[in-house]
C-alpha cells in the first residue's frame, strides 16, 4: 500500500512554509499594534461547543464536522472554526473578571477542519487567522476591527479589496425580518433548491446565503433586512458607516449577506477581492453580543473576524505579489577530508552562535559539488576547510559574488565573525 496524505490535506514544504511564516508574522505584528494578544485553544472541542453556538441547522454542523466518540464515550469534534472555542476559553478562564482589562483582544492562528469537497483555496484541513474582541458594544470597535483587517491587506500588498457590509440588527429586528422572509419565500417554495426548502423551515435567512442558481433568482427581490432594523440597530449601523468613511475605508452595502454562522447580530462584513475575473471572499466576520452569555458567562458584546491562510496565499500568488522573504545564507563551509570534519563542525556552530546562518558539507563530496551547493543556498560567503587549514589554524573566506577574499584565523572566526562579514560584504 502506498501511504499518502489524506484527501483534502497538504504538506507545506520549506519553500512554501517561508511564505506562510511571513504572512503570519505580518499578521502578528499588525495585531500587536492594536493591542491584541495570542490565544491557543485545543484542536478538538466537545461537540456541543460547536453545535450549540454555530447552529444545529448550519451546513457546518449538519454536513461538515469531523466528529467522533472518544474512548471515554465523549462526543468530540475537530474545530471547524475559531470563534466558538475562543468564547468557550474566555468564559472558562473567567477573562470577564473585573481585574482583566477590557476590552479583551485576542487573536489565533491554527488549523481548522471541515469535511468539504476539496478545491482551490478550500481544504478539509485549512488554516485560519482570526481575532476576537470582547467587552465593547461601541460601534467604533466594529470599525477598528474591520480597519485592522484592511490594514493587514495593505501591508501584504493585496489589491482590489472591497468591503461588503450589512447589519442583522438586534434579535427583535432579526425575528421580524425572519417572518417577512418566510412570507416572501413560501409562495415560491417549490422553486427553491432542496437545501433551501429545508432552510426555509429551519433558518430562512440562510436561503439568502445560498450559491444555487435557483435560490439566487428567488431572493433577487426579497425584502431587505435594513428595512426591519429597530431604532437602536439603525443608529449602530449608521455610526459604523460614518466611522468607516472617516477612516477612508470604502464599502458597499450587501443586504443579501447573512454569514454562515447563527451567532451574529448587528454588523457583519466580508472583504472580497478579484482574482482572474472571479470574486473571492478573503476575510469575514461580525458582531456577536449573545455568545458569551450562551456559554454561561455574563452578557458580553463581542466582535471578530476570520481569514483563511490558504486562500490569502493563493490571492498573493495570483496577484503577482512578491513577498520580501530572506533566502540568502550568510556562509557556507566546503569541507575537504576527514581531518577537517570535527573542526568544520566547531567553526560552523561558533558562527551560528554569533547570529549568522551557516551550513557545511556532510557528504564528503568533491569541491565542485560543494561550491554548487553554496550557489544553490545563495551563500554570501564561502570558506574552504581542508586538513592543511586545520593544521595552520586559519582559512580563506571569500565573497561569493565579488570573489574578494581574506585569510582569517579560527580564533577570529569563532569570536568576531561580524567584523569579517562586514569587511568582505561592504
From Swiss-Prot:
Keyword terms, alphabetized: Aminoacyl-tRNA synthetase, ATP-binding, Cytoplasm, Ligase, Nucleotide-binding, Protein biosynthesis
Keyword Plastid on entry: no
Leading EC class: ligase
EC number, UniProt record: 6.1.1.21
Gene3D superfamilies (alphabetical): Anticodon-binding domain, Bira Bifunctional Protein, Domain 2
Pfam families tied to this protein: HGTP_anticodon, tRNA-synt_His
Main location, first listed in the record: cytoplasm
Subunit structure: Homodimer.
Alphabetized NCBIfam families for the sequence: hisS
Protein family per UniProt: Belongs to the class-II aminoacyl-tRNA synthetase family.
Protein name: Histidine--tRNA ligase
Gene field: hisS
